[in-house]
Amino acid sequence: MRRRLAGCLATAQMASCLFPPNLSDGPTNLPLAEDIEKNPTVFGELLRGEAPIRKLHECEAYLSFRNVKNYAPLAGLVIPKRRRPQDPDGLRKVDVSLLEDMRRVALEVCQREQPEAFAANDYWLRFHRRPWHSVDHLHLHVLAPASKVSSWTAFIFLAGSPWSLDADALLEKLRRSRE
């Protein structure tokens, strides 16, 4: 066991060794209300109204709210109400419409909350990769203005790093994929 763990930690595949994908973690066939009721994450608590929230947007399928961590003047999150694991690398071509919708909500929030940053393209839309996330429910970070973030925030949201993925890059990759 010790040798296997050391091997996992020594490779670029650390996340998949420590947190293998759960093949049952795709969208459920449960009614949305039941899916929300069974959601064990803090986002499930927010969706059920069990914890305070500063909503930025809500519609039938998505919720956007302010992050409790103030990474930027606008530090928002966009989540699908139906729980999906926080595994952007595990998403497939069939998930393009989900990501397009999440991106659209994030851009609407950015345009409303930080219009100057939006007009100047001074914003980031990022996913954290496994295992570098704190809530295992798919969520997209919207940060604006990006020019105002700290150097630490810039590091933890560095697009293309082993821990962070740009939403547009992910969408482009999925659109080009064959599966």
What does each model-identified segment do?
Residues R2-E179:
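HIT superfamily nucleotide-processing domains
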